[in-house]
Amino acid sequence: MATNEDQKQTESGRHQEVGHKSLLQSDALYQYILETSVFPREHEAMKELREVTAKHPWNIMTTSADEGQFLSMLLKLINAKNTMEIGVYTGYSLLATALAIPEDGKILAMDINKENYELGLPVIKKAGVDHKIDFREGPALPVLDEMIKDEKNHGSYDFIFVDADKDNYLNYHKRLIDLVKVGGVIGYDNTLWNGSVVAPPDAPLRKYVRYYRDFVLELNKALAVDPRIEICMLPVGDGITICRRIK
């Protein structure tokens, strides 16, 4: 069992590793938010899954604890019941969703790596919410294309969260806009992409950050002028853009 000090070091270290993922100006301020309003109210299962994920070599991919709290609040505010998640990893945001929606709520969860999902599955099962999850391994686009063919799927989702391959974000949006209901919400994660969206051309960015930055910028420009949605870009985690379908 990790000590409180271990947990602090894990969170702080990860925060530094990704270059202020919370986009705040100091680690101390981010730690204040976590210790004051996030960790004290974090569900025990969420805490356990966060600690399990911290030991995984790709833990940089997980949803931050403050973003998990935000998603939980949002889901409850909009009374979401039928939801979708593209990009699962070990399931931290998935668990946040499963805990927030009603007992008869559903989550269609898609990821290309089932092994990562199974790492968090025991925690999800222990929390008693695994019955809400329909996990499908593989690329999401073919699944979405099949769903769109059936009219009954149009406008059937209350909430959709996307945290997957950034080079396909626009492709996802073109399909998801038909699947989310009018008044429903789509959340796109990483839309400030480690702050690189405002980095100068010659900035010393990591190769993967530089590669995906153009796709993130393209998405942000498209969402900003899409008349079918209202948007709100928030500096939570690595940036999340909330899109509410209005027509």
From Swiss-Prot:
List of residues binding substrate: 21, 163, 194
Protein name (Swiss-Prot/TrEMBL): Caffeoyl-CoA O-methyltransferase
GO MF term list: caffeoyl-CoA O-methyltransferase activity; metal ion binding
Source species: Medicago sativa (Alfalfa)
Family in the record: Belongs to the class I-like SAM-binding methyltransferase superfamily. Cation-dependent O-methyltransferase family. CCoAMT subfamily.
Encoding gene, per UniProt annotation: CCOMT
Binding site for S-adenosyl-L-methionine: 63, 85, 87-88, 93, 111, 140, 165
Domain of life: Eukaryota
Known cofactor(s): Ca(2+); Mg(2+); Zn(2+)
Role played: Methylates caffeoyl-CoA to feruloyl-CoA and 5-hydroxyferuloyl-CoA to sinapoyl-CoA. Plays a role in the synthesis of feruloylated polysaccharides. Involved in the reinforcement of the plant cell wall. Also involved in the responding to wounding or pathogen challenge by the increased formation of cell wall-bound ferulic acid polymers.
Cofactor annotation comment: Binds 1 divalent metal cation per subunit. Fully active with Ca(2+), Mg(2+) or Zn(2+) ions. Active at 35% with Mn(2+) ion.
